[in-house]
């Protein structure tokens, strides 16, 4: 299980630090949030994205016991924006949609911080310990 930057290094490339070739477990690139972003109602959004936000789930055993659209805690300035990739099992809306969770084989990665996300975060860790790697 990978968390935050841990998820980012599992992709192919990230823009952070003038560009980093990563591990390539997941296809795709990590891009920086635009400096000037607005929400759906036109309100300005700050970067880094910091705070609680809903995660829209795609069916996966790691979400067992966690309702769809549960709020998790985020702190990040970079994102995996290809929300249509086969590996995306959770998305979040912050100015635009980005991947909040990726999964492939026995690997599960999240952009948010389960350790700061109270009961849902604890449940996610329980699910990881119980997960047999099948989807």
What are the language-model segments listed below?
Residues 29-135:
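Amide-donor transfer/coupling interface in amidating biosynthetic enzymes
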């Amino acid at each position: 299980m990978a968390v935050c930057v841990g998820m980012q290094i599992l992709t192919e490339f990230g823009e952070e630090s003038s560009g980093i070739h990563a591990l390539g477990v997941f296809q795709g690139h990590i891009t920086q949030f635009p400096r000037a972003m607005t929400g759906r109602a036109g309100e300005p959004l700050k970067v880094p994205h910091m705070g609680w936000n809903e995660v829209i789930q795609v069916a996966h055993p790691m979400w067992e016991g966690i309702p769809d659209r549960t709020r998790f805690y985020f702190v990040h300035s970079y994102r995996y924006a290809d929300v249509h990739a086969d590996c995306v099992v959770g998305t979040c809306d912050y100015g635009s949609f980005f991947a909040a969770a990726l999964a492939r084989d026995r690997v599960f990665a999240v952009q948010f911080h389960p350790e700061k996300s109270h009961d849902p975060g604890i449940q996610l860790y329980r699910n990881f310990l119980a997960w047999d790697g099948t989807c």
